[in-house]
Each structure stands twice: as C-alpha cells, then as structure tokens.
C-alpha cells in the first residue's frame, strides 16, 4: 500500500474538520436537538395533563349535572306538594264559604218564614176580630161569642 502525501493531507484535513465540527458545529446542533426533544416531551406531558384535566372536568360536569337533576327533582316534588297543599286549602276554604253561605241562606229563609207566619197571624187575628164583630152584631149572647173568639185565638 502506497501512502502518499495527498492521502496524509486528506486524513489530517479530515481530522481537523471533525475536530472543528465537534467543537463548533456539533454542540449547537445537539443543543437544538435536545431543546426540541425537551419541547416535545413537555408538549406530550402537557397533552397528558390536559387529557387528565379534561377527564376530570368531564367527571365534575357529569357530577354537577346529576346533582342539578336531583335538586331539580326535589324542587319539582316540593312544588307539587305545595300545589296539592294550596289546592286542599282552597277546597277547604271553598267548603267553609259554601257552608257559610248555605247557613246564611237557611237563616234568611227561616227569618222570612217567621215573618210570614207573624204576618199571617196578624191577618188572621184581624179577620177573627172582624168575624167576632159581625157575630156580636147578629147575636146578643156575648158569652157564646167570647168562647168562639177564645177558641180562634187559641188555634192561632
């Protein structure tokens, strides 16, 4: 094998080139690669955290939705109970009002009946007195007439 100066010069130039690259070119490239690897790793970990946060948020949203539905159901049940209570109170109040009106009407009917009876008694008494006067005019026997008048008054 023949080693000449050209090959030796090329070998020295190659070694110098490699040393130059290792000293000045390789560190910035490695730094850029490491920086990019770190950014990718950070991005992946950030994506993992975001995924976990999303799952947690979805879980929380589901829980809150369930709680809201339960609270809404409780509120609806309370509203239905209150509605039933109000209806019962209104029915009871209406029943009391009806009973009051019926009692008042019956009292008015009874008062009107008493007034009519009293008016009728007065008219019968007037007629009895008029009849007694006619009887007295026709007959002289006062004792018999007074018995008749007393019987009429007793019947009234």
Curated annotation (Swiss-Prot):
The keyword Cell inner membrane is assigned to this record: yes
Gene Ontology CC, one term: proton-transporting ATP synthase complex
Database matches in Pfam families: ATP-synt_B
CDD domains associated with the record: ATP-synt_Fo_b (cd06503)
Chief location bin: membrane
Keyword S-adenosyl-L-methionine: no
Entry keyword set: ATP synthesis, Cell inner membrane, Cell membrane, CF(0), Hydrogen ion transport, Ion transport, Membrane, Transmembrane, Transmembrane helix, Transport
Origin: domain of life: Bacteria
Transmembrane segments: 11-31
Subcellular location, record wording: Cell inner membrane
Entry-linked SUPFAM superfamilies: F1F0 ATP synthase subunit B, membrane domain
Family annotation (Gene3D superfamilies): 6.10.250.1580
GO MF annotations, alphabetized: proton-transporting ATP synthase activity, rotational mechanism; proton-transporting ATPase activity, rotational mechanism
Membrane topology summary: Single-pass membrane protein
Database matches in InterPro entries: ATP_synth_B-like_membr_sf (IPR028987), ATP_synth_b/b'su_bac/chlpt (IPR002146), ATP_synth_F0_bsu_bac (IPR005864), ATP_synthase_B_chain (IPR050059)
Quaternary structure (record): F-type ATPases have 2 components, F(1) - the catalytic core - and F(0) - the membrane proton channel. F(1) has five subunits: alpha(3), beta(3), gamma(1), delta(1), epsilon(1). F(0) has three main subunits: a(1), b(2) and c(10-14). The alpha and beta chains form an alternating ring which encloses part of the gamma chain. F(1) is attached to F(0) by a central stalk formed by the gamma and epsilon chains, while a peripheral stalk is formed by the delta and b chains.
PANTHER family (UniProt xref): ATP SYNTHASE SUBUNIT B, ATP SYNTHASE SUBUNIT B', CHLOROPLASTIC
Similarity section: Belongs to the ATPase B chain family.
Function: F(1)F(0) ATP synthase produces ATP from ADP in the presence of a proton or sodium gradient. F-type ATPases consist of two structural domains, F(1) containing the extramembraneous catalytic core and F(0) containing the membrane proton channel, linked together by a central stalk and a peripheral stalk. During catalysis, ATP synthesis in the catalytic domain of F(1) is coupled via a rotary mechanism of the central stalk subunits to proton translocation.
Protein name: ATP synthase subunit b
Source species of the chain: Cronobacter sakazakii (strain ATCC BAA-894) (Enterobacter sakazakii)
Lineage: Bacteria, Pseudomonadati, Pseudomonadota, Gammaproteobacteria, Enterobacterales
Gene giving rise to this polypeptide: atpF
